[in-house]
């Protein structure tokens, strides 16, 4: 009898080069162990305000996309009127991957899922007279404050926008309670950025073909979190919820379950 070989398709396709997944025992205070002299854990945590870490970060199984099977917990990243970092007028709560991996060569896919909630959803603009009052959500910058790709929310509308080199390439209404899944397709050689996205448990689909962008990095430039331009006014506290944060090369993993499923 001839043997029969069954080929079982893999759930994921690419090779993970870095991940920010949280296991069941991880707590937010573990991020306080990181320092320039003690670079431990998945993230650098130094861009934040003057309050304790618990004011800005919390991890919980309730904070992840239920379709994400690679994380056991998601993370709440909050921003408020204490979130000035180093005396800046902008408010910031941001995590940066802690890794020695090369995050700036070839083509890489930068994955994450994002949600706002009705009770803690981002505020409307502080004033319609302040069109620059907006949020930079998960940006990629080499020369701050320019971002070669980023999500933005706010201004004079409740729209979530994706930009490349400062130009809007995709947008959608931000609906509280909806999980938005993204992957930035960054080709550092061709200097282009494309976008894959979906909602809930739906598989990622490419919605923007690669467009030109000033892609450059020293592998320390991916900011996971929020930057708010308050222009000196009070903005209150807002929460965003994140899960499924990882970077891969090769073929893209489109399943929201992620590479560990």
Question: Language-model segments: which ranges?
Answer:
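Localized edge beta-strand/strand-to-loop motifs within extracellular or lumenal beta-rich domains
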Residues: 175-194, 199-200
């Amino acid at each position: 009898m001839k043997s029969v070989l069954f080929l079982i398709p893999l759930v994921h396709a690419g090779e993970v080069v870095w991940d920010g997944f949280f296991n069941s025992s991880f707590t937010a205070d573990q991020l306080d162990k990181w320092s320039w002299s003690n670079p431990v854990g998945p993230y650098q945590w130094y861009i934040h305000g003057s309050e304790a870490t618990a004011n800005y970060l919390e991890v919980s199984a309730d904070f992840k996309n239920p379709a994400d099977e690679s994380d056991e917990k998601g993370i709440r990243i909050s921003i408020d009127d204490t979130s000035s970092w180093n005396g800046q007028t902008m408010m910031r709560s941001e995590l940066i991957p802690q890794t020695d991996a090369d995050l700036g060569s070839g083509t890489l896919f930068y994955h994450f899922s994002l949600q706002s909630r009705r009770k803690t959803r981002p505020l409307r603009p502080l004033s319609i007279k302040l069109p620059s009052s907006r949020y930079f959500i998960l940006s990629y910058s080499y020369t701050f404050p320019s971002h070669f790709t980023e999500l933005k929310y706010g201004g004079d509308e409740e729209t979530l926008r994706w930009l490349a080199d400062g130009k809007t390439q995709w947008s959608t209404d931000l609906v509280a309670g909806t999980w938005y899944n993204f992957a930035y397709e960054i080709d550092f050689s061709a200097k282009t950025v494309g976008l894959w996205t979906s909602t809930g448990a739906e598989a990622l689909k490419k919605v923007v073909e690669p467009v030109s962008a000033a892609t450059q990095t020293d592998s320390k430039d991916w900011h996971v979190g929020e930057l708010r331009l308050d222009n000196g006014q009070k903005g209150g506290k807002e929460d965003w919820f994140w899960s499924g944060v990882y970077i891969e090369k090769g073929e893209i993993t489109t399943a929201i379950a992620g590479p560990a499923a």
